[in-house]
């Protein structure tokens, strides 16, 4: 970065170009800090999924490189909202926060506000921001996050709102600065976008088509993370099971997993999300063979009715899903299975719901995220007739939640008294004498410890099951 001189012609290489603008922004920030006699602060707020959380770490990396000091206070000199648009109420939440920020900006003329992420990919949203929230300084989407420094520089040199939204891209820019939330674990993007177009989901329209990173770049990033103290990585993609299909030399996710498993010093590998339609026998075998892969699979069901699954455009039926579960359990008997289930999808009947309930009873999920269907403007499902009666949907939701919780409690209780490996993750927020960690199966454990234990693995006896978490103690002679 030090080799990028501001007197040079702006580089055309994507990475060098952004490093150039980082240096330029750095000069502007240093000058303003000198005038104000204090450091400039920045605050990033993330709405939505782990992909967004990882993007926010990149945004924060650029901001801190430029010279901003991170704070959680929205009174900061620079506030950026990385938005989600999976549900329409997520949009309303952002509009509400912007109204809150407008008062801060009136008091601080140097304050800048930026909006990015999935919500900004909707033209109606951008138009509303342009007309009703003119105090916003910078608006960009999901495809050009790597250009953040350049866009910020443009705003620093201009008095008007900067808007830069791309419909799609095939570009992936490596090696930009990043500021991780945790020192010992990290998300790693292996791909971007989604090609699945489930009828209820807006993601493919705002995240674009699938594009995979080169395996060598992923391996190099993880090796660098491990050298920096990371012991657990989460491989991220909207559908990791379709990784590598669009590469010049195609690579499967199973092959990538085996390569990541070879990295010395890495202790744990997680991944999400897995679409059942692309879950191969070879991936199941790789999970069985790779000792660092955690014993946890998040496998969204969405519905147990083959009829509803077809309308959802999920590309599998109930029998195919149950076959995958059977194969997973045969290969990895102690694997924890979690899922997502939607209740009240348009046209869902009592019979359809009972099929979902039957699958839940048959699979016995360790836990499940259950949702009442939320109409999402811009998706095929939103225009479907035969929307369900809200009272009936609520009744079904309550029945499903009760069943899920009973099964989860039974599954959790089966581990009480066992000694298992736990990654210590943080000091307990309610009791400072306890450390909170996670099992390989993603269950939470609280046990006596000190902050210096964070980021390390311990054998812990699960002394008491509390339903959704365990109390434990360091095992003797472990």
Where are these regions (language model features)?
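Short flexible coil/turn linkers enriched for glycine and charged/polar residues
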Residues: 181-184, 194-196, 293, 303, ...
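Terminal RNA-binding accessory module
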Residues: 2, 383-478
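Radical SAM enzyme [4Fe-4S]-AdoMet core and its adjacent flexible, acidic
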Residues: 49, 244-265, 312-315, 373-406
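Conserved, mostly hydrophobic/aromatic
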Residues: 198, 218, 235, 271, ...
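Contiguous mid-protein beta-loop-alpha structural module that forms a pocket-lining wall or clamp
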Residues: 348, 364-365
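Proteins enriched for Cys/Gly/acidic motifs involved in redox and nucleic-acid/cofactor modification
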Residues: 1-243, 282, 297, 319-330, ...
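Hydrophobic C-terminal alpha-helix "anchor/cap" residues
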Residues: 63, 129-130, 260, 287, ...
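Conserved SAM/AdoMet-binding glycine-rich loop
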Residues: 110-115, 124, 227-350
């Amino acid at each position: 970065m030090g080799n990028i001189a501001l007197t040079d012609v702006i580089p055309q290489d994507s990475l060098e170009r952004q490093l150039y603008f980082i240096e330029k922004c750095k000069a502007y920030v240093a000058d303003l800090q000198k005038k104000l006699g204090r450091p400039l602060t920045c605050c990033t707020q993330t709405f939505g999924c782990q992909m967004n959380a990882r993007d926010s770490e990149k945004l924060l990396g650029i901001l801190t490189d430029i010279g901003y000091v991170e704070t959680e206070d929205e009174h900061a000199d620079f506030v950026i909202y990385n938005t989600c648009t999976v549900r329409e109420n997520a949009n309303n939440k952002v509009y509400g926060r912007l109204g809150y920020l407008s008062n801060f900006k009136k008091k601080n003329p140097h304050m800048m506000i930026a909006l990015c992420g999935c919500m900004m990919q909707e033209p109606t949203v951008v138009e509303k921001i342009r007309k009703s929230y003119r105090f916003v300084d910078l608006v960009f989407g999901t495809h050009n996050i790597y250009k953040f420094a350049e866009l910020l520089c443009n705003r620093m040199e201009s008095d008007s709102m900067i808007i830069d939204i791309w419909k799609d891209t095939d570009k992936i820019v490596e090696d930009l600065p990043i500021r991780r939330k945790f020192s010992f674990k990290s998300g790693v993007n292996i791909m971007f976008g989604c090609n699945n177009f489930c009828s209820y989901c807006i993601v493919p329209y705002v995240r674009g088509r699938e594009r995979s990173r080169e395996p060598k770049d992923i391996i190099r990033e993880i090796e660098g993370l491990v050298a920096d103290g990371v012991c657990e990585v989460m491989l991220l993609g909207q559908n990791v099971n379709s990784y590598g299909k669009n590469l010049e030399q195609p690579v499967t996710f199973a092959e990538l997993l085996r390569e990541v498993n070879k990295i010395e010093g890495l202790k744990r590998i997680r991944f999400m999300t897995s679409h059942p339609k692309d879950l191969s026998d070879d991936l199941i075998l790789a999970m069985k063979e790779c000792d660092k892969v955690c014993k946890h699979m998040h496998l969204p069901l969405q519905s147990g009715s083959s009829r509803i699954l077809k309308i959802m455009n999920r590309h599998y039926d109930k029998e195919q899903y149950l076959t995958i579960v059977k194969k997973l359990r045969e290969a990895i008997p102690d694997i924890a299975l979690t899922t997502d289930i939607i209740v009240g999808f348009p046209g869902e009947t009592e019979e359809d719901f009972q099929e979902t309930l039957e699958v839940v009873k048959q699979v016995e999920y360790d836990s499940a995220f259950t949702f009442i269907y939320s109409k999402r403007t811009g998706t095929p499902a939103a225009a479907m007739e035969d929307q369900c009666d809200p009272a009936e949907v609520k009744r079904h939701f309550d029945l499903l939640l009760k069943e899920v919780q009973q099964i989860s409690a039974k599954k959790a209780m089966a581990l009480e008294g066992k000694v298992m490996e736990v990654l210590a993750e943080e000091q307990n927020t309610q009791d400072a004498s306890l450390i909170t960690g996670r099992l390989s199966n993603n269950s939470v454990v609280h046990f006596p410890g000190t902050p210096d234990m964070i980021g390390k693995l311990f054998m812990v006896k699960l002394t008491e099951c509390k339903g959704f978490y365990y109390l434990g103690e360091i095992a003797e002679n472990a």
